[in-house]
Amino acid sequence: MPQFLSEDFLLDSEFARRLYHEYAVDQPIFDYHCHLPPEQIAENYRFKNLYDIWLKGDHYKWRAMRTNGVPERLCTGDASDWEKFEAWAATVPHTIGNPLYHWTHLELRRPFGVTGTLLSPSTAKDIWDRCNAMLERDDFTARGIMQQMNVKMVGTTDDPIDDLRHHKTVAQDSSFSIKVLPSWRPDKAFNIELATFNDYMAKLGEVSDTDIRRFSDLQAALTKRLDHFAAHGCKVSDHALDVVMFAEADDATLDSILARRLSGETLSEHEVAQFKTGVLVWLGAEYARRGWVQQYHIGALRNNNLRQFKLLGPDVGFDSINDRPLAQELSRLLSKQNEENLLPKTILYCLNPRDNEVLGTMIGNFQGEGMPGKMQFGSGWWFNDQKDGMQRQMTQLAQLGLLSRFVGMLTDSRSFLSYTRHEYFRRILCQMIGRWVEDGEAPADLPLLGEMVKNISFDNAKNYFAIEL
């Protein structure tokens, strides 16, 4: 019987073990999309305790705790840090079968070195004390953990109005070699249907010194901010397309839509689609001219629990998977961006695994001459960021495209302890390829398949994003 979380965890064949230990394990981490707070990296934040680094802001854990009957006070409320950690420790034994159980113990093992002990009510105090003692050391600050985990690059998620001063601080510090670069997340600039849109336009106008009245004014304001981001090393954009919309409109129509919204009018769904299409097509061309990568995260159904949304706000664990069709609108959007050969490198992620084959085939429609893997089907996202979800995403990518050109894993996390997700991904990748070899579906060519694993683990992303390390 295999031991839980051994050095050969998930590696169920000799070939898989060789792939992982000889080609994957020592590869650095290129974490091209995350939600780490850049100010904590800039100030080399020292975490107060295990709750501060591990549970604070983690909606994955909060969902599990709520499902286990834990009161909200112990999730997001005013309970002490220890009480919240104790409640999490009591929940962990009930998460067997959920990726949280694997993640929890991988994160305790690296970087804390906790092995042979499972988190539970009986071990909570010992683990709390041991890890808190380590968090007082210099190698367990925000930067220290990144260095321990062999991180080479992180891409944070940043709003166009951000001043990016924390990125500048990191970039100017010659003692810290890890690249910390902003990613452009302009959702607030095109979600015209939201009640917050007009206030955001005022803020965008202020930071860009632009009076936004017409669509061309919005373009001018965003261009200034794109230049600002580019000056700070940005090479990546990210868009939450909860619902993919497409409806064309001329400039006069876009001017009218924007003016009426700024005057307080409510727009029709068709007008919202026209405006979003206009912004996305224009931004796509800007990304292409600048050599940026655009990412589309598709299919989240957000803020489902209205009562909790009013109490706690967004992004606290009340989101789920949408089932709106996306193929036709996405095809038209990408085709429109491609009309003048201004479709940038693009990564498509779907939250509904039903859409895996849709994206897996969609990327084949728009690949670029002389650019391997220009269009990417992104790694299993959010609810698919687990063993089965990763296996399905990679299997379908292999069947419908070229797995060997895949840019691999990203944490998409707010936690400095989530880097073990790269380890988890690499183990699953090696397990999958090892099984192909065992079944005679792939040659037992270690150099060939080892190079493929090495590329997916790090080199493909480094080359795709064209960021000098």
Curated annotation (Swiss-Prot):
Pathway: Carbohydrate metabolism; pentose and glucuronate interconversion. It catalyses: D-glucuronate = D-fructuronate; aldehydo-D-galacturonate = keto-D-tagaturonate. GO terms for biological process: D-galacturonate catabolic process; D-glucuronate catabolic process. Transmembrane segments: none annotated. It is an enzyme of class 5 (isomerase). One of its GO terms (molecular function) is glucuronate isomerase activity. Its EC number is 5.3.1.12. The keyword Mitochondrion does not apply. This is Uronate isomerase. It comes from Pectobacterium carotovorum subsp. carotovorum (strain PC1). The gene is uxaC.
